Amino acid sequence: MKRKSRFWPILLGFTVLVAAGLYYVVRMFSVDLPDYPKVDKVTWLEQNWSQSQRGWMHHADQGTVTFSMPYEWLAALEQPTFTLTAGPPFLSSDYLDRFGFITADSSGLPVGFAHGGDLVDPKTAQPWVNPATGKPLTTVGLTCAACHTGRFTYKGTAVMVDGGPALTDLGKFRKASGLALFFTRYAPFRFDRFATAVLGPQADEKARAVLKKQLDKVLAGGRIEVDLDKKVAEKSIEEGFGRLDALNRIGNQVFSLDLERPENYVAQSAPVAFPHIWDTSWFDWVQYNASIMQPMVRNAGEALGVRAFINLTKSEQPLFASTVKVDTIFEIEQQLAGKQPTAENGFTGLRPPRWPSNLFGSIDTKLATEGAAVYADRCQGCHLPPVGSEGFWEQKHWTNENSAGERYLRVPIINVENIGTDPAQAQSMAERKVKLPSELGIDTDSFGSALGALVAKTAARWYDNQTPPVPAEQREIMNGNRQNGIQAPLAYKARPLDGIWATPPFLHNGSVPTIDALLSPAGERPKTFWLGNREYDPDKLGYLTDELKGGFKFDTAKPGNSNAGHEFSDTPGPGVIGPALKPDEKAALIAYLKTL
């Protein structure tokens, strides 16, 4: 009896010790998130999509497995908080909202989350199965809408913008999901709850042991990535709300993690603001640095970067086999693009939102008319005549028709030395090299060209694997009737400004919070400000920038974060594109931009 009576105090002491250690871990690695006030009303601005089109786009499955786990695991996770009893679910709408994810109207997942079919590893051609039932588990990952759906709040109303830049913090979300998995494995009693939710209450110890091994494998993969991040941390820049070093992250995922080559991993040194995507299907070049021509390469590359599974290393299975859903990606692009734009019909896919006068106040039409003249004098040379104007449709602004009868908008490409904005994103793509095995059949070490070739091979593998294989003519259509053009100029493109009022923060790296600040000399722009606030300022055209607990303090003095360039100033210098705007000119131009 004495031995038995001593057992429980020892067990209790051990449990307290483990709990204390985990509490320290939680305190050390906790994710600090903003608290947002509840809104009274939600409104989606009209942008030429039906409710069903919008709902489909919000959850279209590209084949991504962003969180390196099946849906059934994600649904069973608890939030990474310290508790011995059952914690709140990780997929709680209120919790995900704090990262910036928008609650969907009709789905249990937020906007931008896609729940797909069976999760099959292309390296083995085997499904990921529930060890208790033997049934395949299913995919879950991010889709386009996660990064390209905007939101503002204004006096208690949430205003949603399809195709606008999201205000999410994917870095915080990645950290939180990793901690949630860690706690699931090591926090007392949490694995038991997880196993019951995933396997069912009748699962035996053998099935639970297999599940634990699966979890250990995922955690080991996460540790590899954490270790790689530590090695490049000195050169990495925090992305924060509304930004991502997208191209470098895609490269790291494909050429380092998927290819199992740690030497190809680089710092996230060139974060960019999530771009708005209306009109872009009809640009001759896309990405901020005008680096990619073909829609399929752009979009399938994004899917790989958001962690679609791909086989680049196992010769037992076809190389370039992946979970990427090329057919869905084609449908996404079709819905964004619509038909060939014309002077009569304009853009017929996703359109920019109109200024919501009922919420933000009416536009001063007299002032806007004056602003049109300012735009013609100061902006039109780079950003083209206003969309919808007669001048916009002049042939000189468009390519000649291709064999499919399509033509594309020639977006002006401005050298970094002339525009004067932060060069990091353009330099990063131009200078990055990758080391590749000969088995891939890619004969370049240039990051951009290698990525273009790899994505094209991935799409081709999908076409070949269909029954029957997709014919050449249909492949051309699905690829967007454009060649796989890749370039890496030390330059940025100047796109049309329709809907620009709905796309803060500004400049490619998100370093200027409002249009009002952007139209001011660089020395008058905020040197530091907070990102993560959702409240919109209809006078300055941007988010409020007050200090926000759990938000992101943007420091323009850090590499990659410069707010210089694109400057109207009476002092000549790099990046000065015109004389300073007088206060009445600035007010008029702001009024005019609201009309676009």
Curated annotation (Swiss-Prot):
Keywords: Membrane, Plasmid, Transmembrane, Transmembrane helix
Name of the protein this chain belongs to: Uncharacterized protein y4iJ
PANTHER family: BLR7738 PROTEIN, CYTOCHROME C PEROXIDASE-RELATED
An MF annotation (GO) of this entry: cytochrome-c peroxidase activity
A GO cellular component entry from the record: membrane
Species: Sinorhizobium fredii (strain NBRC 101917 / NGR234)
Domain of life: Bacteria
Record-annotated membrane-spanning stretches: 7-26
Coiled coil: none
Membrane topology of the entry: Single-pass membrane protein
NCBIfam families: CytoC_perox (NF040606)
Record's subcellular location: Membrane
